[in-house]
Amino acid sequence: MKVLRFIVVAGMCICSCFVTKAQDKVEGSMAVDVVSQYVWRGQDLGNASIQPGLGISYKGLSLSAWGSVGLTSADDTKEFDLTLGYSAGGFNIGVTDYWFNAGLDGKNRYFRYNSHSTNHVFEGNIGYDFGCLSLQWYTNFAGNDGVNEDGDRAYSSYFEIGVPFSFVSCDWEAVVGAVPFATSFYGTTGFAVTEVALKATKEFSIGDKVTVPVYMGVSANPCSQNCHFYAGFAFQL
C-alpha cells in the first residue's frame, strides 16, 4: 500500500504543475481487436484472441474496461481489466484491476477479493509522454502478486521505454521493457530485460465513423529467450 500512496501523491503533485485544455463533455470509445497471438510485456498469454474495449473520459479522467478471450483453446488466458486513469499534457497516472481465469482461487470467481485466494491483481502506473519518447512505470500493490526470492510479496514492477516514429506510410513504435527485481510474476531472478519489440500500424477508414487499424509486431523476450511475431486488426468507433 505504501507504493500506491507514493504513486497517488506523486501524481497529484505533478498534476498541479500542468495546465491543459480539458474536454467539454463526456466522450466514449469502443473497440474490438482480433489478434493472432496475445503477447503482453514479452510474455505469451495465448493464441488467437478477441479483445473488446470500452471507455469513457471527461476532463482528463478516464474509466475503461478491457477483456481478452482465446478463440482456439479453452486453456488460453481469459482476462477482464478495469482501469481508472488521469492524464494531463504528457503526464498520466492510473490504477488497474486485472482479473485472470487462473490464480489463487481454484473456482475462478470474479468477486473473490481475499488477499490470499483471489485471481485479481491490482497495479498502479505512472508515466510521461514527451512526444518523441514515452516512459512508463507499473507496480503491483495488492492481489495475486508474485513473490521474491525470500518468499515475500515482490511488488512486481515493470518499466517501459517507447519511441514512436513514422516510416513507409505506417506508424511504428520501438519498445524496451524491463523488470527491475526478482519476482515470480514475471519469472525473473533479478533485473531482467523482458521485452524488445517493434510494432507497425496502418489505419483504414470505413465510412465516417469506423476506423480499422491493422498492425503487426515482433516481441522478443531476452530473459526467457522467446520471440513472438503477431498480427491483428481492430474496429474502433
Task: List the model feature ranges, each with a label.
Residues 22-27, 94, 165-173, 201-214:
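Short loop/turn motifs that connect adjacent beta-strands in outer-membrane beta-barrel proteins
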Residues 23-57:
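Outer-membrane beta-barrel initiation region
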Residues 30-38, 61-71, 93-101, 108, ...:
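Transmembrane beta-strand segments that form the barrel wall of outer-membrane beta-barrel proteins
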